[in-house]
Curated annotation (Swiss-Prot):
Organism: Rickettsia bellii (strain RML369-C)
Membrane-spanning ranges: 33-53, 67-87, 95-115, 133-153, 167-187, 206-226
GO molecular function: phosphatidate cytidylyltransferase activity
Major subcellular site: membrane
Keywords: Cell membrane, Lipid biosynthesis, Lipid metabolism, Membrane, Nucleotidyltransferase, Phospholipid biosynthesis, Phospholipid metabolism, Transferase, Transmembrane, Transmembrane helix
Membrane topology: Multi-pass membrane protein
Protein name: Phosphatidate cytidylyltransferase
PROSITE patterns named among the record's database cross-references: CDS
Reaction it catalyzes: a 1,2-diacyl-sn-glycero-3-phosphate + CTP + H(+) = a CDP-1,2-diacyl-sn-glycerol + diphosphate
EC number: 2.7.7.41
EC category: transferase
Location in or out of the cell: Cell membrane
């Protein structure tokens, strides 16, 4: 009994430590990408290319060098990142890209906080045992709120009407947040399939590059599609 309680206590301490590390990593990553997007665009391109290389490398290692899965990786990783680079090549989309990263990263952080705080039913226990429905809902609503608050910044401007209207913005942000979580589960499925917990350990609190940027896989195409509706 004492040993069991000790293990549970250590597990909780580890989870709390991972949460702090994840928040600290976000504090470093978010400003870095904001600066790159708004003022140092070549740096943003370099960062995204490095992200693509890192994701592909980890995907290759994770799937045990399987040719079939490598081909899947060559589709689901370069294409979404290319779409983000294409969108960011137009300066008028600077705020759009920055908002996008704030949404997909905030849902991840707040989903983890909500899940740890509220607990409750598991979202997909066989794929990602730690995810909960309470965390999902908390993350989605928080991401929508974060995006709405960002829209009050005086210099905030997105040409697309669906992003400049705060009601639509909240709905789109929640949609992207939900998709980000689905994208996370999508990659988690493959990690479970190949018996891997994290794709790497390069980013404290997150694991590998693929663990941190897996939300791009499904959300970037949706962002590109929605942005194109009004153009």
């Amino acid at each position: 009994m004492i040993i069991q309680k000790g293990k549970e206590h250590l597990a909780k301490d580890k989870q709390k430590s991972n949460l702090y590390l994840r928040i600290l990593s976000g504090i470093v990553l978010v400003p870095s990408f904001v600066v790159a997007i708004l003022w140092l665009k070549p740096l943003f391109y370099v960062l995204m290319i490095l992200v693509a290389i890192g994701m592909l490398s980890e995907w290759y290692d994770m799937t045990h060098s399987s040719i079939m899965y490598l081909l899947i990786g060559l589709i689901i990783i370069p294409i979404p990142i290319s779409l983000l680079i294409f969108l960011s090549s137009n300066p008028i989309n600077n705020w759009l890209i920055m908002l996008y990263f704030c949404i997909v990263w905030s849902v991840d952080i707040f989903a983890m906080i909500g899940g740890k705080t509220l607990g409750g039913a598991k979202l997909a226990p066989k794929i990602s045992p730690k995810k909960t429905w309470s965390g999902l809902i908390t993350g989605i609503l928080s991401a929508g709120l974060v995006a709405t608050l960002i829209s009050f910044i005086p210099s905030f401007y997105i040409e697309n009407y669906y992003f400049s209207n705060r009601i639509y913005l909240f709905i789109i942000s929640c949609t992207l947040a939900l998709t980000a979580q689905l994208s996370d589960l999508f990659i988690s499925y493959f990690k479970r399939k190949f018996n891997i917990k994290d794709s790497g350990n390069i980013i404290p609190g997150h694991g590998g590059v693929l663990d941190r940027f897996d939300s791009i896989i499904l959300t970037a195409p949706i962002l590109f599609f929605i942005n194109g509706l009004y153009l």
